[in-house]
Amino acid sequence: MSQFKSRFGIDIDGTVTTPDTLIPHINKQYNTNIVLDDVIEYDFLSAFPHPVDRKEFAKWFKENEGYMYSVSHIAKDAKKILDQWQHQYELIYISARDTSVFPITQKWFEENQVPFHHIDLIGSHDKLEAAKKHQVEVFFEDKHDNAVLLAEELKIPVILFDTPYNRKAVPNTVVRVNNWLEANKWIKQHF
């Protein structure tokens, strides 16, 4: 019997970290002034005022992702809420990050004192199998299509952190929140 009441699946980027945390790095590299409100699709390139070669961007991102992840900013109140949850719920982070950045990711969690029980970097945005494997009972996400898929396929609630890039319609099992305090309020009412 587990010591935890429930298992939470939690995305990292844009959920535990601020959704705009990568933007200053992109602006510096591409000499742009993108802000989060410009990113209305889950695709930074959609916000550029000029065309950018996708292959070049992907190459630059891959070369710099470790550093960018290592200096990512934690979302307001995320640490406080996760600290409260760590003894009651099993915190399982499931991220699209590549496994090659696992040491950097774990170090970021430790340096920022963000509690975790397991970190699963799956290298793609398809989190369905990992969520099934870990038998999560609720998922915290910022990517619209992931939230909808997880909610519909697993029949679990998904907490969707509101951003300009995820404002499409969602089913009733996807609960849109503005911040970690609202997420915590929902969890207290339902878990």
Regions found by a protein language model. Give the residues of each.
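Generic structural signal for beta-strand residues in well-ordered domains
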Residues: 1, 7-9, 84, 112, ...
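Active-site neighborhood of HAD-like aspartate-dependent phosphohydrolases
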Residues: 1-57
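Generic beta-sheet signal
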Residues: 6-8, 91, 139
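Exposed alpha-helical structural elements
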Residues: 21, 40, 52-60, 81, ...
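Short N-terminal helix-initiation segments at or just after the protein's N-terminus
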Residues: 27-38, 54-57, 77-82, 101-104, ...
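Metal-dependent phosphoesterase signature
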Residues: 45-77
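Short, acidic loop-to-helix structural element flanking the phosphoryl-transfer center
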Residues: 66-93, 98-106
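C-terminal cap/substrate-recognition subdomain and adjoining C-terminal extension
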Residues: 87, 96-191
